[in-house]
Amino acid sequence: MRRTIILLVGLLLCLHTQAQMHSYDTSFTYSQQNFVDTIPIEVVDDQIYIMGTVGGHPCRFNLDTGSSQGSLYMGSRVQGLRSLGNVVSRDAAGNLDTVAVVELPSLTLGKLTIDHYVASVFQREKPRYTYDAILGFDLLNKGLCCKIDARQGWMILTDRRDYFDHEPGVGLHYRLKWFVPYVLVSPFKRHTDEVLFDTGSRQLFTMNKESFDVHAYKSKNVESQVEERVNGSFTIGQLGAERPSEVVFMKLDRLKWDTFSFKSVRAMTTQGASRIGASILRYGTVTINGFRRKIFFQPYEGGDSVEVNNKTYTIAYVPGRDGRPVVGLLTKSSDEYRAGLRQGDTIMAIDGKAVASFQDFQRYPFVEGQTYTLTVRGQNGMERQVPFTR
């Protein structure tokens, strides 16, 4: 099935600088010790959601291990926030900016109450979100272990460092960079790549473009796994879109997690960090041990490999200079390209209704399978109409 990307929101890394007014810390507290709790989760569109409360009110959290700390958006229904100042933050597209930092009221996850949890506050990039706040990797880095089973719909959370020691699984040590976990995987034979384990990213694997270039320089085997090259941009972080550059689409023979192989993996390059994303949970459980700094993968079906044969994005829309949606990335193999859409086209109207902003485009009530007429302005300034099937 064709995949269309409207927005990718990912990595939030709080940087320690001389000018910051609030630094990374894990001074929040847990209400329990020596506990084990099984908490229901939802995994929707390769994102992990947990129901809890903040200040006694229901709250839907998104668990994002690629975010160093919690975050929420201006206008969130979360109330009772206490300002802590500002911090310099870097997003998935590599943008830097100063953002507000707040302390949340007491929040609960299952039986656990967490006090003094800190979150960054960002401008809304979408008119609405399917969650109220993000829980970052600091939740585990503080000293917790968790096991996530998307198939069963639960997460086991514990502060017992040895609780999962005797469970099966293929483990990788991680090291913290900017307070988030990086592991070593092998995308090509005799090659390793340092990747962020990022449940805020949907795709199984994306590779940093500079890392790809190094791999390709060292081995002709890398180029044989390239399907297409396109100039454009597709990642939008909390602070803006990445700059246009070459994006490489690949079909990897295998992606190795230590001794386990994901076979026939489609992936693409990005200007941000290489990442393993939340769709790894389609194929097995993940256990994160915040004490031993290890991440374990256990395939649902056992064995030492799984056939992935996934699809990747073929088109991406990003905000243009005038605020309208622009085709930031488009492959020649896509239905949109065959219909006449071109990279750099600005979306001016949908079925004759003007699109004044990127948010208008995001809000449009598209129906899956229905065909629309887009009025687009090409890079030559000329307008034309293109059929578009959602």
Please name every model-derived segment.
Residues 1-24:
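Bacterial Sec-dependent N-terminal signal peptides
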Residues 19-390:
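Pepsin/retropepsin-fold aspartyl endopeptidases
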